Amino acid sequence: MRSLHRTQIKPNTCRKNKITGQKPGSDRKGKNFDERQNVIFDRNWYFYRGDVRNAESPVYNDSAWRKVDLPHDWLIYDTKNLYEDSIGWYRKNFAYAPDKTGNDDRVILRFEGGYMDSSIYVNGEHLGDWKYGYSTFDWDITDALHKGDNEIVLRVVFQAPNSRWYSGAGIYRNVWMIRLPKTHIPLDGIYTSSVETKNGYDLTIDTELEWGTDSGNYE
């Protein structure tokens, strides 16, 4: 369940968190809503240029693929055909262990950029598509994971012409794995606005909260 909470700050004042009556960022047991682990996810990907059948399958044999680290741009391998339509596949295997406390945390993959159109698969399951090559996109992959080895696959389609400048093709920016507690502030879930007054500025902070099933009763 997701909810929105608003805090207003006037000049020379400090308001307590309306969610708990405590300082922002903690629940009644002292656990931080913003407690998260950010791990760079750039190394040891496998890449293939071209379209292949069943490459999203976790049992697909990618031993002949090129091993790459991100950021990666496949167009630079053939500078005489920079604007040729093409498809690229990226695969990465990693080990996942649930939270040691027994609480199921949330696992988010953040792609800072994949040009041009991307489809993401986890353990063979198609989770979705992203059609905006220049913008960051996030996927909650928690429910598709299992303990032990897991396979992340991204299929990227490049079509030309699509830009007035050189765009590159592939996962051309960093990828992050982010682990969040069940109850957390979503990524990009804090919004601020200000209004000028005769005494200065009134600041409004809107904060989204994603509630875990065991988050307790908050008023």
Region spans (language model):
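Beta-strand-rich binding/interaction modules
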Residues: 122, 201-219
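Extended carbohydrate-recognition surfaces in non-catalytic/accessory domains of CAZymes
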Residues: 4-115, 162, 168-171, 183
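Generic detector of bulky aromatic hydrophobic side chains
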Residues: 27-28, 46, 129, 211-215
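Accessory beta-strand-rich segments of carbohydrate-active enzymes
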Residues: 51, 80, 85-188, 193, ...
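Short, solvent-exposed loop/linker segments at the N-terminal edge
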Residues: 194-201
